[in-house]
Amino acid sequence: MLHTLHRSPWLTDFAALLRLLSEGDELLLLQDGVTAAVDGNRYLESLRNAPIKVYALNEDLIARGLTGRISNDIIPIDYTDFVRLTVKHSSQMAW
């Protein structure tokens, strides 16, 4: 399943998101959700322990001035990669 986090993790039921993640799922951080990719925050630590890959939309990282502050555990992607993720996963959950 592809999970997409559009909102800031501080304004989301992040505990519910973590509970619903399964091995093999992927999470895409976009819009204000990219703030979860900033190195050293508590949400990133929780994502590191999840059995998933985490991506962040590069355009949103740039728009928020976060490109130099994200963790190496986060994979920056462009819109083409975003489309590939949506094609890969038949089911999606937006947060």
Curated annotation (Swiss-Prot):
Matching InterPro entries: DsrEFH-like, Sulphur_relay_TusB, Sulphur_relay_TusB/DsrH
Signal peptide: none
Keyword presence, Repressor: no
One CC-aspect GO term: sulfurtransferase complex
Entry annotated with the keyword ATP-binding: no
Pfam entry (one): DsrH
Superkingdom of origin organism: Bacteria
Gene3D superfamilies, A to Z: DsrEFH-like
Keywords on record: Cytoplasm, tRNA processing
Predominant subcellular localization, coarse grouping: cytoplasm
Subcellular location: Cytoplasm
A GO BP annotation: tRNA wobble position uridine thiolation
Disulphide-bridged cysteine pairs: none
HAMAP family: Thiourid_synth_B
Family label: Belongs to the DsrH/TusB family.
Summary of the function given for this chain in its UniProt record: Part of a sulfur-relay system required for 2-thiolation of 5-methylaminomethyl-2-thiouridine (mnm(5)s(2)U) at tRNA wobble positions.
Subunit structure comment from the entry: Heterohexamer, formed by a dimer of trimers. The hexameric TusBCD complex contains 2 copies each of TusB, TusC and TusD. The TusBCD complex interacts with TusE.
Name this protein carries in UniProt: Protein TusB
